[in-house]
């Protein structure tokens, strides 16, 4: 049973519209859809809230550490609420998926994503769900850092917004219908 949804990103106005904050975007939209106002929770180093989907209480977490230190925030929440890795969904940007694509995955490595790398180290486990929001790759592989820390163009943002819409539905399906049905639905789009 899912208990915690975590959106990954970097805090601060200068990062708000960057591709690397795709996890924040989807978490914010989910909170808004459920009339949840995220509040600063210093003991979790995060913005934090609670929603109910299908009468099931779900915590929302938006770490306010930088992306590469997200594990600190996640570990604090998991200790406090006794949440196991299998009860967590991490929403993050994914270079290896084109814009407009979104995939749900259970378990696995970090795939070079430093936020996931830190979370895996902090939890001592890879056994959590990931909702991977495709942001595509830059043409020049040496420009990855600049690419993820820039805002997408309006055309690119349209594709990303479509995938965020699918992501919201996938979260609901994961909670109400289970991981297999959610994955099948999402991956058939």
Swiss-Prot record:
One of its GO terms (cellular component) is cytoplasm. One of its GO terms (biological process) is protein quality control for misfolded or incompletely synthesized proteins. Disulfide bonds: none annotated. It is found in: Cytoplasm. One of its GO terms (molecular function) is tRNA binding. It comes from the Bacteria. This is Peptidyl-tRNA hydrolase. It comes from Dichelobacter nodosus (strain VCS1703A). The gene is pth.
């Amino acid at each position: 049973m899912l208990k915690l949804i975590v959106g990954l990103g970097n805090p601060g106005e200068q990062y708000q519209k960057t591709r690397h904050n795709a996890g924040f975007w989807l978490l914010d939209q989910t909170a808004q859809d459920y009339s949840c106002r995220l509040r600063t929770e210093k003991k979790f180093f995060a913005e934090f809230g609670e929603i109910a989907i299908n009468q099931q209480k779900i915590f929302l977490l938006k770490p306010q550490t930088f992306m590469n230190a997200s594990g600190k925030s996640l570990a604090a929440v998991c200790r406090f609420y006794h949440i196991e890795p299998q009860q967590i969904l991490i929403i993050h940007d994914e270079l290896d998926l084109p814009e407009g694509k979104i995939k749900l995955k259970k378990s696995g490595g970090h795939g070079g994503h430093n936020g996931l790398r830190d979370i895996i180290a902090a939890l001592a486990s890879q056994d959590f769900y990931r909702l991977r929001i495709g942001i595509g790759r830059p043409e020049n592989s040496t420009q990855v850092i600049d690419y993820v820390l820039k805002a997408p163009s309006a055309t690119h943002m349209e594709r990303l917004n479509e995938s965020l819409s699918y992501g919201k539905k996938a979260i609901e399906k994961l909670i109400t219908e289970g991981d297999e049905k959610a994955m099948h639905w999402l991956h058939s789009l």
